[in-house]
Amino acid sequence: MSSYYVDGLLSKYTAGSSLFPNVERASCSIGPSGEDYGSARTTAAIAFAPSLSGVYSVSDAVYQSRPVFTSGYGQGQDAHTLHCSLFDQSRLFTDSCCHPEPGPLTSPPDKQYRMYPWMRASDPTRKRGRQTYSRYQTLELEKEFHFNRYLTRRRRIEIAHALCLSERQIKIWFQNRRMKWKKDHKEEPVSTPSGEKDCDIQPVSEAEEPKAVNNPERRFGVRNG
């Protein structure tokens, strides 16, 4: 490297006290409008352009376009206003969703809930349906009634589990069966022994009864002689 080139380069660097003599320290605080940061950035760009043009031989036209970047900072107030407006809009939308306007107490007929039969209140005057038992269940209950007309609680639980019925159903069935049994036996006539007939039984008259009492021999079978 020639000494002429080195001396010429050093003379350019030593011409000023610093490479960026007019650059000011930018403030870190951003005001509500954002203009402080934009003005500091604009000043730094203007001071930075002539210093570099002497070293790197860059035309000033390139650095004249630097303020394009500062135009965004100059609109800081509008940007903040736009951001706040979007936030306010979202907040208003959220409030309107969370706090709907009071409407009528009665909903339209097409939006009413569907009522199922099991959701309605039971009518006390309505009669319940009669419980039907299968043939196998009836046969087992009849067999149990033939041996025991009254069941203990333990036996009732066993039969209920065996026949897949409830204790209440077993209890009601036995109550009805006992009432039927009493009714059938109450209406049956008293049967007489098979060897006797109604015609063989003759009523004793009052005229013949004193003769048997007054004649002791005939009464006890005593014969004379």
From Swiss-Prot:
DNA-binding region per UniProt: 126-185
Chief location of this protein within or outside the cell: nucleus
This protein's record includes keyword Nucleus: yes
A Gene Ontology BP annotation from the UniProt entry: anterior/posterior pattern specification
One example GO MF annotation: RNA polymerase II cis-regulatory region sequence-specific DNA binding
UniProt biased composition (Basic and acidic residues): 184-200, 208-225
Segments carrying motif Antp-type hexapeptide: 115-120
TM region(s), chain numbering: none
Keyword field contains Transcription: yes
Domain of life: Eukaryota
InterPro entries: Antp_homeobox, HD, HD_metazoa, Homeobox_antennapedia, Homeobox_Antennapedia_CS, Homeobox_CS, Homeodomain-like_sf
Residue ranges, annotated region (Disordered): 183-225
Gene Ontology, cellular component aspect: nucleus
Entry keywords, A to Z: Developmental protein, DNA-binding, Homeobox, Nucleus, Transcription, Transcription regulation
Function, as annotated: Sequence-specific transcription factor which is part of a developmental regulatory system that provides cells with specific positional identities on the anterior-posterior axis.
PANTHER family with a match to the protein in the record: HOMEOBOX PROTEIN HOX, HOMEOBOX PROTEIN HOX-A5
Family recorded in the similarity comment: Belongs to the Antp homeobox family.
Protein name: Homeobox protein Hox-A7
UniProt source species: Morone saxatilis
